[in-house]
């Protein structure tokens, strides 16, 4: 299965009648492996900050997390594994695997829990595959 198919079929799938606003699978260096049509382009320094927060949980909390210059308030995640952010009525979940970052961005009516479930399920599968 191609990386694009993972995004299209597993991240952009319908959950209780709702979809993520956008999603992607990125390398740890920010290289895009696959993305949905509306996925924002991360800046290199944003990826650097996200990777540092995985290594040093709490690093982004004082300043917030920036994604394509949009600021997200960092909310409780799983240290070293999942970073969650909130912005208005939406948010973001990023799950780190051995080689990738699985990213889901949502807006209402999708809930943070639904986004976490979609991103977490694919992230767990990639971890099981050694990726």
Swiss-Prot record:
Short motif (Involved in PIP2 interaction): ranges: 81-97
Compartment(s) of residence: Cytoplasm, Cytoskeleton
Any one Pfam family match given in the protein's UniProt record, by short name: Profilin
Top-level division of the source organism's lineage: Eukaryota
Record PTM text: Phosphorylated by MAP kinases.
Main location: cytoplasm
UniProt keyword annotation of Disulfide bond present: yes
UniProt GO cellular component terms: cell cortex; cytoskeleton
Family: Belongs to the profilin family.
Entry protein name: Profilin-6
Organism: Corylus avellana (European hazel)
Biological classification of the source: Eukaryota, Viridiplantae, Streptophyta, Embryophyta, Tracheophyta
């Amino acid at each position: 299965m191609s990386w694009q198919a993972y995004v299209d079929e597993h991240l952009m799938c319908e959950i209780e009648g709702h979809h993520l606003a956008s999603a992607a699978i990125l390398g740890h260096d920010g290289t895009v492996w696959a993305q949905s049509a509306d996925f924002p382009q991360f800046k290199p320094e944003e990826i650097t900050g996200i990777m540092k927060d995985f290594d040093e949980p709490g690093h982004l909390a004082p300043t917030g997390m920036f994604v394509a210059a949009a600021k997200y308030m960092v909310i409780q995640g799983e240290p070293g594994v999942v970073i969650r952010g909130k912005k208005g009525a939406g948010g973001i979940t990023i799950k780190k695997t051995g080689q990738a970052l699985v990213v889901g961005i949502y807006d209402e009516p999708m809930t943070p829990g639904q986004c976490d479930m979609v991103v977490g399920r694919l992230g767990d599968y990639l971890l099981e595959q050694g990726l």
